[in-house]
Amino acid sequence: MTTTQNKIKNNDITIRQTQIDDATKLPAIEQSAGQLFSTLEDLRWISESGVQSVEKHLAFIDQQGHWVAVNSDNEPVGFIMTTALPESLFIHELSVSQDWQNRGIGKLLIQKVKDKAKVHKFDSVTLTTFRHVPWNAPYYQRLGFSILPESEIPHSLQEILDDEVERGGFVKETRCAMKFEV
């Protein structure tokens, strides 16, 4: 793997800042990635639900909190969306197209966020996810994230978890907040 200031490369995959022209291709990637949930009885509804709008992607792109993994044809195959919280850089969404999963692309995207967090002097990278889904909390734990005990969840992160339950339809006990110390 080679690293430059703005890009991470691994074989035929490059991680770069998302461009405006990429935005229309990203909902299809999220839809494809979400199909994995169709294999889980209790979460099948996620594979049938909506995805981030092009407008939402554009807002994250405008805030420079959005990176894509592109193939050798410069076509997006995965993305990661982040936003700054008072205490951390928060991963809002990570999606890799089904055809490109299990190739280390998610790991590369997360590494880009970890690098950006360090450069911008964040103490940590955080996210919210499912505790029991193999490609969620257990995956992030393999990448160095730890599940935060409820008593240690910062207010801004707790608000996100609460919103996921209230508006997102998630069951509170299935969700967790995770943190990677930069």
Question: Which residues are covered by each model-predicted region?
Answer:
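Conserved beta-strand in the GNAT
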Residues: V68, E75-T83, F90-S95
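A short beta-loop-alpha structural element at the N-terminal edge
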Residues: T14-A28
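A short helix-loop-beta-strand connector motif used in the catalytic cores of GNAT acetyltransferases and
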Residues: Q52-V68, F90, V171-E173
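Conserved acetyl-CoA-binding loop-helix of GNAT-fold acetyltransferases
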Residues: V96, N102-D115, R142
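Conserved GNAT-fold acetyl-CoA-binding loop/helix
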Residues: Q31-H57
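Conserved beta-strand-loop-alpha-helix junction that forms the acyl-donor binding cleft
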Residues: L127-N136, I153-Q158
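A short, internal acetyl-CoA/4′-phosphopantetheine-binding micro-motif in the GNAT/acyltransferase core
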Residues: L94-Q101, T129-R131
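Conserved GNAT acetyl-CoA-binding A-motif
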Residues: A117-T129
